[in-house]
Swiss-Prot record:
Predicted to be exported by the Tat system. The position of the signal peptide cleavage has not been experimentally proven. It is an enzyme of class 3 (hydrolase). It comes from Streptomyces niveus (Streptomyces spheroides). Its cofactor is NAD(+). Residues 12-22, 475-494 have a biased composition (Basic and acidic residues). GO terms for molecular function: hydrolase activity, acting on glycosyl bonds; nucleotide binding. Substrate binds at Y252, R271, Y283, P284, N285, H286, Y365. Keywords: Glycosidase, Hydrolase, NAD, Signal. Belongs to the Gfo/Idh/MocA family. Glycosyl hydrolase 109 subfamily. Its EC number is 3.2.1.-. It comes from the Bacteria. This is Glycosyl hydrolase family 109 protein. The lineage of its organism: Bacteria, Bacillati, Actinomycetota, Actinomycetes, Kitasatosporales.
Amino acid sequence: MNDAAPQNPGQDEAKGTGEKDNGGSMSPRSALRTTAGVAGAGLGLSALGTGTASASVPEAAQTAVPAAESDESAAPKRQGRTMAGVPFERRSTVRVGIIGLGNRGGSMIDLFLAVPGVRVVALCDTVRDKAASAAAKVVKAGQPAPAVYTKDEHDYEQLCARGDVDFVYVATPWDFHFEMAKTAMLNGKHVGVECPVAMRLDELWKLVDLSERTRRHCMQLENCAYGKNEMRVLRMAHAGLFGDLLHGAGAYNHDLRGLMFDPDYYEGPWRRLWHTRLRGDLYPNHGFGPVANYLDINRGDRAVSITSMGTPALGLAQYREENMPPGDASWKETYVSSDRTISLVQTAKGRVVRLEHDVSTPHPYSRINSLGGTRGVFEDYPERIYIEPDHANDEWGDFAAYADWDHWLWKEHANPPGGHGGMDYIMVFRLMQCVRLGLVPDFDVYDAATWTAPVPLSHASIKANGKPQQIPDFTRGEWKKSRPGTDSEKPSEP
């Protein structure tokens, strides 16, 4: 039986920062209601500054970790069938609806339009000028004028209900991600969500369960998994060049102080306000996703627990003191998020992954992106490698010498369009290729949940003075089965 989903139910641009400006902590539904009166609060980059600076931490973040054993028996009972290894249903043209047309969505539309076999049929943003600008891009690309939804903060529901949309792309502020992904799947649409896919552990479980029940894919669109260096290291790791894999590290260390206090860049304080609510790693996906791919997390190994520690929260307050005028709204905010969060993730095979997050102190951009095994190590920022027998005498080698290991996607698209060094286009191209050809996606809802779980769990660990927190087995045992991921084989069809 075919288990495809039914048809109807900092760094320079050469490497790319991977920064994705999407989008503050109440439930998503109440956030939607509250933001209705925020002037100029587009879904693309909404203000979301609804509470005071002392807004309470989400309840699910405070009680993020259930009392559970270390195996899959602790997971809630599966309500559907696994989505691991389930292909998309094949189609000649992929019809895309885009929700959120701010900094991220407004630029990503160009890449969807650049991929053959893709039509952008519907757009949604409460800021009408942004929607109109995006619609003009569609027409300029030679496609029919898309349907446009700008009525209010609930109009995205109409986009999701359309019968001519196959895939929904969500690029809104973080509060909206869960609700929009949920709505898309309930309307029979596959959905791709910018980082992070949700902010609460219970929401992650709900997305997993809903994906299984509806047979719709829900994916975290992690562009850094498609970086040129990341994909080269992935192929080398899976070919055994690093020996038996032991450890890795990833991060999102990106000085965002100026952008978070810029009244125009984010079109409101939503990004900064998260620093008044959670103490942990707010953005683990860029670092965790690629390393999880190296280690075959959810494909032979799994993340079991996380231990997190955080520094005092001083950087944003100091920046405000030195740069913001008296009377600025930011003076009402109290920052609690650690300037630097450091987490250690243990896997079922005993490997260790180090994660870092720092967006509020001065430092060069880095995602760390390292991998070590019994035969050597790779470290990024700057890129360097040391593996036996190629290197000796404690001298780093030139990573460029391993260009033959580049992934087929980078060999075919040597100079891809778009930002972040081309990884955005590679991601969109491959995603749309999988949808169009009816292939299994490179990553799925289980990866989305696993890569995002450090958000609430690091907060819980820091609050518990570094006590380890269990990472749920979102796959309910499917992780034990080896299966393909981002290290894909080139399909026979273009």
